[in-house]
C-alpha cells in the first residue's frame, strides 16, 4: 500500500492472484507512460505502477501530487486477504466504516468525517453512486475485491474532475488487465459461519486486443442483524465482469467494460405489534450493472489524447417480508444513471498538462413501499440532469514545486448553475522531505429520493463545502522509515440529514397531505470537520510495519438543541497497525490491530457507540510458482462491538484458502 502525503508502506507481502505481472512490489519501481485521460486505463491497472491516476484522471508521479492519496496495489489487496472492499479501505487513514449487521448489511464509508453519500465511488472509470439510494451514495456492502487490481482513495473535496458530490473524496477501483498472451487464475476459500468464496478469471493480450473475463461467488451464513437476535442473517453474491480494449490503429482504440452482480442479504426489521427492532425473516434482492464504452483518439503525435465515452449504472432493489399480509414486497426501487462525457488531455509542454472535458449526467429513480394497508402504492418517479464543463492545468514551476489549478461549472436542472474551484501544490525540500497542500470545493444537490420519496422534502437546499489540507512527508535513510502528518479542515453548509418524527406528531412536515410518516429529510445549516492524520511505515529486512492514526472532530454548528454536538457515527480516534515478518521460504505472517474510538449513533449524542480494539492474524505461503495457500483469523479475541446502534457484528472468524495462477 502506498499512502501519498501520508506514508509509503512496506513492500507487498504476497503474489496477487489475477495478474501474471503481479509480483512483490518494488518501492523503487517507476513506470514511464504518456499521460492519458483515462482513470481506468492500462497504467491504472498496472500493479507495479507508482503513479497516481485519480487526482488528475491521468498518471502522475506521486511526488508531484498535492492531494492526499492512498494507493492499494494488486499485491496489497491479495496480501490483506479481505473479501469486502469496505473492510480493506476502512483500515486506511482517514476512513471510518459503519455497517448494519454482518456482511451484506448496509455499509457506509465516511472520509474525513464527511457523510458517506459525499464520497464518489468509481469502478473502471464509471461513477457507481446509486440515484435511488437516499443520499445518492453507494452501498459498499455489495462491492467485493474480486477482480480489482488497484484502489485509490483520494481524501478531501475533489470537485473539478469528479463532480461536486466528492466533498469527502473519491474511491476509485480499477479491475485487472493481463500482461501475457494468455493467463488466468483461481481462488477458493472457506471459513466459519458457513462462508465460501470462489472466483476465477482468464485473460489475454495481443497486438490489437486486450481482454479479460472473471466470475465469482461469495456466500456466508452471517450473524444476526439485530444484536439481540437468535437467527443469523446471511448474504450471498454472484458476479461476472469483463473488459476489452481493441486497438484499431496506433492512435485509435475502443474500450468496453462491464460488471454485473446479483445479491441477496437477510436483515431484521420492526414487526408488529411492538414495532421494535427484532428478529424477522426479511430479505433484500439487489441487482447491479455497471457498463462503459469509450473511444480513445490520440492526435498531435500523441500530445493530445481524446476520450469520448458513455457510462451506465443500474440498480434494482426489492425488499421482502414473508410475514406481511397481502403482499410480501415492502420496498421496490430502481436507480439508473447515464453519463455522456468527453475528456481531453493536452501536453502543452513536457512540464505542463491540461485536462478538460464536458459531461452530461442523467439520473432517474423509481421507488415505492407496499404495505398490508397499501399493497399497490403509486411509485414515486423523478429524473434530473446535470451538465458540466471542467478544466485543470497541472505542471512544474520549478524542479521542486508542482501545482494544479482547476475549475468546474455545473448546471443542475433544478438547482441552477454553480462554479467550483480547486488548487493543490507539492514542494520537495531536498531528497527526503515533501510538503503538500490543497483546497477544494463541493456542491451536492438534494437527491431524487430526498426530494420525492415518501420521506422527501421539496424545501431542501443544496449542500456546499470548502475543504483544506496541509501535510508533510519525510523519508529516513534509504526509505526504511517514512513518516507523515496531515491536517485538514472542512466547512459544510446545508448538510442533509434524516429527521425522525415523534410518535403522534402533528407537525405538518410529519403529516404531508394528512398522512403520517416516520420522518423526513432536512438541512443542517452548518457543520464542520477538522483533524490530523499520522502515518508511519518501516521496512527493515524481513520485518515491516505499517501504522496510521486519525483524529477526526466533527461538529454541528447550527442553532438549536444539537449545536456543538458531534455528527453521528464519526469516531474521533482511529488507529491501525500491521506488523509482518517474512521468511526466506516465502512464508509471511501478519498481526493486525484495529482501534476505533467512541462515537455517537445519533445527532443528539444520546447513544454512545463504545470504543473497540480488534486483533487479526493472517499468514500465506507460496507452495510453488503456481499455488499459494493462506489463512486468517479475524477478531481473534472474539470482542463484541457496534458500528451502528443495536446492529450485530461478527465475532471471531477463521478462513483458509488457496490461490492458483497460470
Locations of regions flagged by a protein language model:
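Conserved C-terminal beta-signal and adjacent last beta-strands/turns
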Residues: 8, 201-203, 214, 247, ...
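Extracytoplasmic beta-strand/coil segments of soluble accessory domains associated
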Residues: 54, 86, 90-127, 149
Amino acid at each position: 500500500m502506498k499512502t501519498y502525503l501520508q506514508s509509503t508502506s512496506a513492500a507487498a507481502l504476497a503474489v496477487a492472484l489475477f495478474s501474471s505481472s503481479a509480483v512483490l512490489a518494488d518501492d523503487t519501481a517507476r513506470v514511464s507512460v504518456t499521460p492519458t485521460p483515462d482513470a481506468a486505463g492500462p497504467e491504472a491497472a498496472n500493479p507495479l505502477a507508482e503513479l497516481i491516476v485519480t487526482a488528475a484522471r491521468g498518471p502522475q508521479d506521486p511526488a508531484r501530487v498535492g492531494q492526499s492519496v492512498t494507493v492499494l496495489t494488486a499485491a496489497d489487496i491479495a496480501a490483506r486477504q479481505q473479501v469486502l472492499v469496505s473492510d480493506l479501505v476502512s483500515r486506511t487513514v482517514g476512513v471510518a466504516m459503519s455497517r448494519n449487521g454482518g456482511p451484506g448489511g448496509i455499509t457506509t464509508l465516511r472520509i474525513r468525517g464527511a457523510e458517506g453519500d459525499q464520497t464518489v465511488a468509481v469502478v473502471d472509470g464509471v461513477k457507481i453512486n446509486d440515484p435511488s439510494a437516499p443520499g445518492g451514495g453507494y452501498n459498499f456492502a455489495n462491492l467485493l475485491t474480486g477482480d480489482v487490481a488497484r484502489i485509490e482513495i483520494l481524501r478531501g473535496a475533489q470537485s473539478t474532475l469528479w463532480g461536486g458530490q466528492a466533498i469527502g473524496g473519491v474511491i476509485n477501483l480499477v479491475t485487472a488487465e493481463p500482461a501475457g498472451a494468455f493467463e488466468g487464475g483461481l481462488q477458493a476459500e472457506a471459513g466459519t459461519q458457513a462462508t465460501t468464496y470462489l472466483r476465477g478469471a482468464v485473460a489475454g493480450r495481443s497486438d490489437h486486443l486486450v481482454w479479460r473475463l472473471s466470475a465469482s461467488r461469495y456466500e456466508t451464513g452471517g450473524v444476526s442483524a439485530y444484536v439481540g437476535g437468535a437467527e443469523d442473517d446471511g448474504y450471498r453474491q454472484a458476479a461476472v465482469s469483463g473488459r476489452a480494449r481493441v486497438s484499431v490503429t496506433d492512435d485509435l482504440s475502443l474500450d468496453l467494460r462491464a460488471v454485473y452482480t446479483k445479491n441477496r442479504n437477510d436483515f431484521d426489521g420492526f414487526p408488529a405489534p411492538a414495532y421494535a427492532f427484532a428478529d424477522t425473516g426479511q430479505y433484500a434482492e439487489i441487482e447491479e450493472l455497471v457498463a462503459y464504452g469509450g473511444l480513445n483518439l490520440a492526435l498531435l503525435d500523441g500530445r493530445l489524447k481524446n476520450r469520448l465515452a458513455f457510462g451506465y449504472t443500474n440498480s434494482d432493489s426489492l425488499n421482502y417480508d414473508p410475514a406481511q399480509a397481502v403482499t410480501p414486497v415492502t420496498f421496490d426501487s430502481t436507480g439508473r444513471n447515464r453519463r455522456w462525457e468527453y475528456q481531453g488531455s493536452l501536453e502543452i509542454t513536457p512540464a505542463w498538462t491540461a485536462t478538460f472535458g464536458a459531461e452530461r449526467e442523467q439520473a432517474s429513480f423509481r421507488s415505492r413501499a407496499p404495505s398490508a394497508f397499501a399493497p399497490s402504492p403509486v411509485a414515486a418517479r423523478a429524473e434530473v440532469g446535470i451538465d458540466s464543463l471542467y478544466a485543470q492545468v497541472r505542471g512544474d514551476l520549478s524542479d521542486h514545486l508542482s501545482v494544479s489549478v482547476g475549475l468546474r461549472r455545473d448546471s443542475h436542472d433544478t438547482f441552477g448553475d454553480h462554479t467550483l474551484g480547486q488548487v493543490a501544490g507539492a514542494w520537495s525540500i531536498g531528497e527526503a522531505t515533501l510538503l503538500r497542500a490543497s483546497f477544494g470545493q463541493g456542491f451536492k444537490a438534494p437527491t431524487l429520493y430526498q426530494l420525492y420519496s415518501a420521506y422527501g422534502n421539496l424545501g431542501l437546499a443544496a449542500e456546499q463545502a470548502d475543504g483544506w489540507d496541509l501535510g508533510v512527508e519525510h523519508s529516513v535513510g534509504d526509505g526504511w522509515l517514512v513518516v507523515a502528518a496531515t491536517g485538514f479542515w472542512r466547512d459544510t453548509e446545508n448538510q442533509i440529514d434524516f429527521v425522525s418524527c415523534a410518535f403522534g406528531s402533528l407537525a405538518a412536515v410529519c403529516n404531508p397531505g394528512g398522512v403520517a410518516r416516520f420522518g423526513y429529510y432536512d438541512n443542517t445549516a452548518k457543520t464542520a470537520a477538522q483533524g490530523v492524520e499520522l502515518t508511519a511505515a518501516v521496512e527493515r529486512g524481513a520485518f515491516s510495519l505499517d501504522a496510521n492514526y486519525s483524529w477526526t472532530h466533527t461538529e454541528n454548528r447550527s442553532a438549536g438543541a444539537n449545536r456543538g454536538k458531534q455528527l453521528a457515527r464519526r469516531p474521533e480516534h482511529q488507529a491501525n497497525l500491521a506488523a509482518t515478518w517474512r521468511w526466506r521460504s516465502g512464508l509471511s505472517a501478519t498481526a493486525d490491530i484495529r482501534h476505533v474510538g467512541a462515537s455517537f449513533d445519533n445527532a443528539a449524542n444520546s447513544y454512545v457507540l463504545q470504543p473497540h480494539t480488534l486483533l487479526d492474524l493472517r499468514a500465506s505461503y507460496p507452495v510453488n510458482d503456481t499455488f499459494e495457500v493462506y489463512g486468517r483469523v479475524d477478531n481473534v479475541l472474539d470482542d463484541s462491538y457496534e458500528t451502528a446502534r443495536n446492529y450485530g457484528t461478527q465475532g471471531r472468524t477463521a478462513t483458509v484458502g488457496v490461490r492458483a495462477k497460470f
